[in-house]
Amino acid sequence: MKNLTPLSLVVVLALVIMSSSCEKQASSEASTTEVVTEKTSTYSETKNAYFGDLHIHTSWSFDAFIYNVRTTPDDAYNYVKGLAIDHVSGKPIQLGRPLDFMAVTDHAEYMGVMMQMIDPDSRLATSEMAKRITSPERDTSRRAFGEIGFSISRNEPFPELLQKDIMKDVWQEIIDAADRHYEPGKFTTFAGYEWTSSPGVRTANPPFARNMHRNVIYRHTDRVSEIPFSSFDSQDPEDLWKWMDHERSKGIDLFAIPHNQNMSDGLMYDLKGMVSGKALDNTYATSRLRNEPIHEVSQIKGTSMTHPVLSPNDEFADFEIYPFTFVASGLPPASQPDGSYVRQALKRGLAMQDDLGANPFKFGFIGSSDGHNSAGPVEEDNYFGKLGNIDMLPEFRIAEENVVLNRVRMSAGGLAGVWANENTRDAIFDGLQNRETFATSGPRIQVRFFGGWGIDKDLLSAPDWLTKSYSQAVPMGTDMKPGKGAPSFIIWAVKDAESANLDRIQVIKLWKGADGKSQERVFDVTWSGDRQVQNGKLPSVGNTVDIASASYTNTIGSVKLSTVWTDPTFDPSQDAAYYLRVLEIPTPRWSTHDAHTLDIAPPSDPPKIIQERAWSSPIWYNSK
């Protein structure tokens, strides 16, 4: 993101579980991490922006291990803190700048089992499966890997690999790693894991699996579940929520973050139960609302905000679309857009909240990486792939013949942004749970968004505008109650200091019409330069990208954009939701950087340039 100037069966099987019996008791092993009870030196009443990654896999995830990843949770934390770590390519990888918070989220299914099978001190090393995994016969080991992968999507686990005491020890090691790297006021870590539900459609040709994955994040490390609830316990998210409610009743604070909605084939935001197929009711709505306050909307396997089919009048809807399901062989079938994207879900929530008595699709936004190298490759000019040796080199990633995994279609990943008083577990967790969050496609763009009534249009020029914003309006992620006239919104964004300038800020408005149907509209509200709206459209900001050198210049765009905007179409009788989209000027995509490295022309698809972006969480207006 720096400002630059002048396969095989194994491949197929990892797709099934890529992401992307449990006793319900608190862990008996208490963390030694000290509870922070005093404010840190970075404490701010008007809150600071913190950037993090809540979706990272290590060798303790099956689908990382099979591609030769051998790095650990400690490596993952070191990488995010700015240190170099080993990469399967043989070259070290290093993040350009440290992040502020992170969680290792290895798959709950067979968590750490693969590493145990190659550990001579583990009893799993003598298992029949371990002998096959470590067999010098390549076909034997591949078949073994395949059987393990299929057992996850089919929900038919190998009993010999589900030994509770081993799983408990591995889980405790993940918790301990989080504690080792927690530095209150400087760097925050969370215990977490991925629940990897991928219900399949076996009758299809070819059979495929649909993504229902969630990452589960814990507030504390001394109050966590004994072992994770996995998709082997249930593939139904509603059962996950019931389990989470039970854990919460024991003083364990946690929430789940859905991701890769784009690969759910319409299940993630279905109008009926995702697995049960039952009609939605108030219990469903309140349970989902309680357990899933934020959704991951941008990551390596694509952006789940919206799709051109669903938003045909949005010129920026076609951004990093990865429209596939998981497949057993060949080219993955397309994931149907209907029910698979966030904007449509927000609209559906507005339409159904009166009937259900609650809005099940009321959530904030974050991004994350889903990197499987103990690292997220979120920088376009520092991209090293997602999944071990399958995409470890540029020539592997952008080969024209690439079909399985569609590696060239993968994004560089996203980041989670949160506004919090300080960089501690409690403060960051509160910010996430309260939905005062924003997502980015990788750059560290900061976004502020407040909504209220009777806001002075000159408020942003006041030195204490932030204090006034919090006192006179509500921040992103919350509700506006009815007021006089039309609502006004305080809108502010500043560029990433090491990335591209800003093109524009847009307000995306969603509302429930008089006919009960939900609608959408995109407003350009502030932009760089002296462009004028022509025939209802703002002209392009321009383009400084040089494809041959994979470079651009910041000679266009703005460092900061801000405004107070009043909705000119407001109808007080209509429920509505508003969120921001902040666009950078065009920059080279990672695949263009790879092509430059190889001294070849970039692939014809996907686009050679992109406009990186950030999205605020919504603000809702309820007419009643």
Give residue ranges: language-model regions.
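C-terminal functional module detector
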Residues: E23-P73, Y77, A84-T126, A130-R132, ...
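Long, charge-dense tracts
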Residues: I217-R219
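Conserved, charged catalytic cores of large soluble enzymes
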Residues: D222, F232-E238, E320
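Bacterial N-terminal signal peptides that target proteins for export
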Residues: M1-L9
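C-terminal motif of bacterial Sec signal peptides marking the signal peptidase cleavage site
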Residues: M18-S21
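Aromatic- and acidic-residue-enriched carbohydrate-binding clefts of CAZyme catalytic domains
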Residues: T126-P157
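Ser/Thr/Asn(+Pro)-rich, low-complexity disordered segments
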Residues: P136, P207, P228, V275-G277
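Active-site gating/metal-coordination segments in enzymes
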Residues: R154, D222-S225
